Every structure is written in structure tokens, then in C-alpha cells.
Amino acid sequence: MRAWIIWSTGLLAYIVAVLDRTTLGVSGLDAADRFSAGPSVLSTFVVLQVVVYAGAQVPAGLLLDRYGSRVLIVTGAALMAAGQVTLALTDSLPLALGARAIVGLGDAVTFISVLRLVPHWFPPRRVPLLTQLTGICGQFGQVLSAIPFLAILASAGWATAYVSVTAFGALAMVLAFALVRDTPRGRVRATETLTVRGTLASVKTVWLRPGTRLGFFTHMGTQFSVTVFALMWGVPYLTVAQGLSTHAAGALLTVSVVAAISAGVVLGILTGRLPHRRSWFVLIIIASNVLIWTVVLALPDRAPLWLLVVLVVVISVGGPGSMVGFDFARTFNPSATLGTAQGMVNMGGFLAALLVMQSMGAILDARGGYSFDAFRVAWTVQYVVWAVAVTGILITRGKARRQMRAEQERSLLETFEAS
């Protein structure tokens, strides 16, 4: 029971992180009025969030290995609360951007810290499913931003809505401080201070493990498409290029969340029971993404609604698919450097998403703005990422398997010699 209480408390902190991550997205029009910002400036908030989140992953992983989950979850909640209360009270655009960066920093340390709790508190056979459930349940934060937060925003205004979110974050911080413990044996104690050279050597060692890179390319190839779709270009594509109403586009994003939840449960069970087939599951998910996008983009005109539904469902499976990358990191890294490895894995999809978002924006501008033909060309940027990711998976998978066999043979030899 204690393990479930600790995981649930960490999960609440992650739900708040997703809530904080998505509040600005649902309040975009209000933000435009409050900060006198046009569409390009508003998109800066999204890009800034991704840049800070991705850039902070390796430092967050190093801090996680040094100080443990409890310290980082509490710190992350405090940073996000500080950023949200600043957004609540300011009408200065530069200050709002700075506050958004602080929110992104707090968000960056939270997810991997909650994931780190799972292998410490649960038996190995449950870890894959609980890893999936962590990612899945965290998406309830998006529901909170879309329903109660938006309702408060509409009825009570900007400041009240953002202060309410700040209060929720403060609650998560207090509960994490009171209830979360790093391991059953007590808290993680800080190791000796590392020099800059020592830190870089540690990062290099973790990255050179084939399992870490396998997780990185897994996260890259599965997660970026749905992230780009949900965070920036999905709604404009559905409404302008495909001719759907805003209501219909919102309904498809709801379908995306349901599809991700359903796929996550199934994938968690499968990866737990068939751990040696994890990379095949990942390759199938990437192949399905490539196939459905090829079908949609090959059409000379707008796609029928049923095909767009299939598109959204298929790319949404990439969200839980990316969680397999963290399972690779856990399998091929010792506990002492697991945080660093998970941070590296988490960079993969977000770096790819950032590059695709920026590249698509440049292509859309070059082709005269939002149109069916412009989007049709812009979405093809994804194929470059898929090619890189699949190549990386195939190469690192072979190296990881050889490393595992060598370690098993070494273990057997040591056992034989000891007997």
C-alpha cells in the first residue's frame, strides 16, 4: 500500500505538470488580448516550452541521480507554481515569457522523477505497465486544463484561473514533500561533488550504452508526430487544410487522448510479457505512422472524416509507444545513472518535435501561409525524422543485444568459477 501511495502522490505532481504545460494552449486567445500578441508571438510560448523542456533533460537527469525523486518533484512543483502565479499577475510579455520558461523547467524535472520511483517501489514485472500508466494518467492534466480551468477562465477571468492552478500546484508540492520517499531504504544521498570533467565523463558513459541510445531513438521515432500535431499544427491543419470546424477538430483531439490511454494499457501489458519484442512493437508503431501519413498526404484533395479519425488514432499510439524508450533505459542502465539515461531518452522526441515544428513553420511561410498544398508539403518533413530514428533503432538494437549476451555469459562464467 505504501508503494501505491508514493506513486500516486508523484503521479499527482505529474498531472499538475501536464495541467501547467497545457493551460496556455487553451487560453491562447485570452493571452493574445492580455499581452497584445499576434500568432507568431504566441507560438513562441510553445517553442520556448519545448526548448526549455528538452534542454533541461540531461541536467535534470544528473540532478535526479544525485538528489533523488523527492527533492526534484518538490522543486519542480515549486518552480511551476512560481511561474503560474507570475503569469496570473503580470501583463508584461517579456515577464510572461520568462514565467513560461520557469514552468517548462519545473515540468522538465517532474516526469523522469516520477518514473524513477517505479522501479524502486514495484517488482520488475509490474514496471512496464506502471511506466505506461504514469504517462497515461498524466494526460488527465490536459483534461483539467480543457474543462475546469477553461470554465474558471471564462467565468472569473485570467488572474483567478491562473491563481487556482497555482494553488493546485502548491498542494502537489506539499503532498510530495510529506509523502514521497525515494526508495524503501530511505532517501537518495548526494554523492561526492563531481568536477565538470567528471560530470561530462558520466554523461558520455551513459550515452555510449547502446540501450540508452536505443531508448533515445525509440522516443524520437514514436513521439514527435503526435506532439507536433497536438501542440502546434494539428488544429490549423484540420480546420484550414481539411475544412473541419473548430468543434470537430477539438473532438478529434479528444479522440487522441482516448486512443493513447487505450493503447498504453495494451502496450504496457505486451512489453511486460514480451520484453524481447519491445523493439518490434516500436518499429510497427513507426511503420503505422508512416503508412497513415502517406495515405493522407497522397490524396489530391481533402481527406474524408473517417480517414482523419484513423490518422489521429494511429499517431496517438506513438505517445505510449515512446514510453518503451524509458523501459530500454531502465533495462540497460544501473540504478545509479538511471535518471541521466531517462533524461537523455526524453530528449529524443522533444528535440525532433521542435525541429519539425520549426521546419514546418518555415515551409508554410515560404509557400504563402496555411493552405492544403502548403501543409501537404510541410508534413513531409516527418519522413526525415522517421528515417533517422529507424536507422538508429536498428543499429543500437543489435549492439544492445550483443551487450546483453556478453553480460549474461560473463555472469555465468563468474558463477561457475565461484562454485
What role is predicted for each listed range?
Residues 24-25, 210-264, 357-361:
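Extracytoplasmic gate region of multi-pass secondary transporters
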Residues 55-94:
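Conserved MFS/SLC helix-loop-helix module at the cytosolic interface between two early adjacent transmembrane helices
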Residues 66-76, 272-287:
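Cytoplasmic membrane-interface "Motif A"-like loop-to-helix N-cap segments
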